[in-house]
Amino acid sequence: YVEGIQDGIADSPEKMKRYLDTIHTKAEVIDDLVNNLSVFSKLELSRLTFEFKEGDINLFMRDFVDDYRLDLEKNSIKLETDIPTDEVIVRMDYEKMSRVFSNLIDNAVKYRSEDNPTLSVSTMCSDGGVYVNISDNGIGIEENELKNVFEGFYRVDSSRSIKGSGLGLGIAKQIVEKHGGKIWLKSDGLGKGTTAVVFLPKI
């Protein structure tokens, strides 16, 4: 596309915009891949440092979701939240867990339904910890693929037409496990949405 611009093939404003949009999209994919590869390799070699602090996960999630509201509105995605005001203290690295939840919300946005797209975020205390659920009503995942989604570079068949490195969930899993927690996905199948669940132990 760059060569096309240099060679004068983009001979109209509309074609130029199309070329530039494509270049921008591909650059974002490359940047995402390089960034994820860096984090993934550090995690694999146990070189990624963590700075754990005690904090209220409910307050953290309310603030975190608020930061996404404008982007969700721009994409005409309905946001539903059920995050109690009760204080729930966990020990976490705020930057690393922000990366985890960003990845999960970005996935929910990327794989959203074309018809009335909805994103739901909730927290619930049980089993000595807190469950954070991030759900969409999008393309869903077949049951036989759920066990593979956290492997590095794995892409489910239904998502391969959508840009992504296939590293995000693998990184999220390793980060959550460093917190003594667990992460998994649930789906009733293709076209029935997906729920990402993160469990973190309470203090």
Question: PLM ranges: what are they?
Answer:
Residues 181-182:
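Conserved glycine-rich
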Residues 108-109:
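Short helix-loop "hinge" at the ATP-lid/N-box region of the Bergerat-fold HATPase_c
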Residues 51-54, 73, 78-88:
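Conserved catalytic submotifs in the C-terminal HATPase_c
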Residues 168, 172:
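Short alpha-helical Gxxx[C/S/T] motif in the catalytic ATP-binding
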Residues 25-30:
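Short alpha-helical segment of the dimerization/phosphotransfer core of two-component systems
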Residues 45-50, 89-92:
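Conserved micro-motifs of the catalytic ATP-binding
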